[in-house]
Curated annotation (Swiss-Prot):
Function: Plays a role in the initiation of viral DNA replication. A dimer of E2 interacts with a dimer of E1 in order to improve specificity of E1 DNA binding activity. Once the complex recognizes and binds DNA at specific sites, the E2 dimer is removed from DNA. E2 also regulates viral transcription through binding to the E2RE response element (5'-ACCNNNNNNGGT-3') present in multiple copies in the regulatory regions of the viral genome. Activates or represses transcription depending on E2RE's position with regards to proximal promoter elements including the TATA-box.
Listed GO MF terms: DNA binding; DNA-binding transcription factor activity; nucleotide binding
Entry protein name: Regulatory protein E2
Subcellular location: Host nucleus
Transactivation domain: annotated segments: 1-143
Top-level lineage group: Viruses
Matches recorded under InterPro entries: E2/EBNA1_C_sf, Nucleotide-bd_a/b_plait_sf, Papillomavirus_E2_C, PPV_E2_N, Reg_prot_E2, Regulatory_protein_E2_N, Regulatory_protein_E2_N_2
Listed Basic and acidic residues bias regions: 189-202, 210-221
Start and end residues of each stretch annotated as DNA-binding domain: 234-310
Entry keyword set: Activator, DNA replication, DNA-binding, Early protein, Host nucleus, Isopeptide bond, Phosphoprotein, Repressor, Transcription, Transcription regulation, Ubl conjugation
The protein's assembly and partners: Binds DNA as homodimer. Interacts with protein E1; this interaction greatly increases E1 DNA-binding activity. Interacts with protein L1; this interaction enhances E2-dependent replication and transcription activation. Interacts with protein L2; this interaction inhibits E2 transcriptional activity but not DNA replication function E2. Interacts with protein E7; this interaction inhibits E7 oncogenic activity. Interacts with host TAF1; this interaction modulates E2-dependent transcriptional regulation. Interacts with host BRD4; this interaction mediates E2 transcriptional activation function.
Length: 310
């Protein structure tokens, strides 16, 4: 069967367009790079971002409605070659909570918009981005008042160490606390060349906190008692500190793991601190075993970092 005239004309025009682009690219410094037939084929030329040459794609998984069973795969390219105002340029893809983009003549250009994809494949306008060992959670899934510059969530673990560790009574904001590191390997975090805003420093700790029975009305003298006294009842907790909308998103996700904790607070902040841009949520456990199970099974956006409110 012979294709119709319109189809033949469209294919011929596309082939000529690719040929002209390759001839133009061959006059640049990029002609010394290794190029394969796949790198220069028409199919890849018309793949997003269109009318650009692309190399070394990395698959990105997006989970819609927070479900791994409702996921789609997209591609972020290590190298993108586009013909801009200053001739041919070589850039790489970037990934953030909004989508996949590249910088075209100084402008961030998204070629995959996760919000639009969520409308097609999801119902709750919630999505998670997963690539290799990194994940991005969209703050828009819990609040319409989110800011575009989202700080990473830091896990704040205020703990009482095991019996073999010496602990001290700690006044929040005034003294340092004695903590013990959890045995085992420290979680690994690979810095992504796509999005420097997700850089973090890893420091893994485990503890549990005993809150003093006497509560001073002066917030500056409020203290957390970590001394191991016979008969004292301790409650294992984990504190997460970060940007409020991001914390709400984490708290929403934790509902899938209700059997791994007793309760979780709403977002709050200490009245004694001047920094109101960060909030805290506290997760309470019935014992250390449950807490350890929670930390083993629940994926938190960034690795644990010890932070004391000042």
């Amino acid at each position: 069967m012979v294709p119709c005239l319109q189809v033949c004309k469209a294919k011929a025009c596309s082939a000529i367009e690719v040929q002209i682009a390759l001839e133009s690219l061959s006059t640049t410094i990029y002609n010394n790079e290794e190029w394969t037939l796949r790198d220069t084929c028409e199919e890849l030329w018309l793949t997003e971002p269109k009318k650009c040459f692309k190399k070394e794609g990395q698959h990105i998984e997006v989970w819609f409605d927070g479900s791994k069973n409702n996921c789609m795969q997209y591609v972020a390219w290590k190298y993108i070659y586009y013909n801009g105002d200053c001739g041919w340029q070589k850039v790489c893809s970037g990934v953030d909570y909004r989508g996949i983009y590249y910088v075209h003549d100084g402008h961030k250009t998204y070629y995959t918009d996760f919000e639009q994809e969520a409308k097609k494949f999801g119902c709750k306008n919630i999505w998670e981005v997963h690539m290799e060992n990194e994940s991005i959670y969209c703050p828009d899934s819990v609040s319409s008042t989110c800011r575009y510059n989202v700080s990473p969530v830091e896990t704040v673990n205020e703990y009482n160490t095991h019996k073999t560790t010496t602990t001290t009574s700690t006044s929040v904001g005034n003294q340092d606390a004695a903590v013990s590191h959890r045995p085992g390997k420290r979680p690994r975090l690979r810095e992504s060349e796509f999005d420097s805003s997700r850089e973090s420093h890893a420091k893994c700790v485990t503890t549990h906190t005993h809150i003093s029975d006497t509560d001073n009305t002066d917030s500056r003298s409020r203290s957390i008692n970590n001394n191991n006294h016979p008969g004292d009842k301790t409650t294992p907790v984990v504190h997460l500190k970060g940007e409020p909308n991001r914390l709400k998103c984490c708290r929403y996700r934790f509902q899938k793991y209700k059997t791994l904790f007793v309760d979780v607070t709403s977002t709050y902040h200490w009245t004694s601190t001047d920094n109101k841009n960060y909030s805290i949520i506290t997760i309470i456990y019935k014992d250390e075993t449950q807490r350890n199970s929670f930390l083993s099974h629940v994926k938190i956006p960034v690795v644990y970092r010890l932070v004391w409110d000042k």
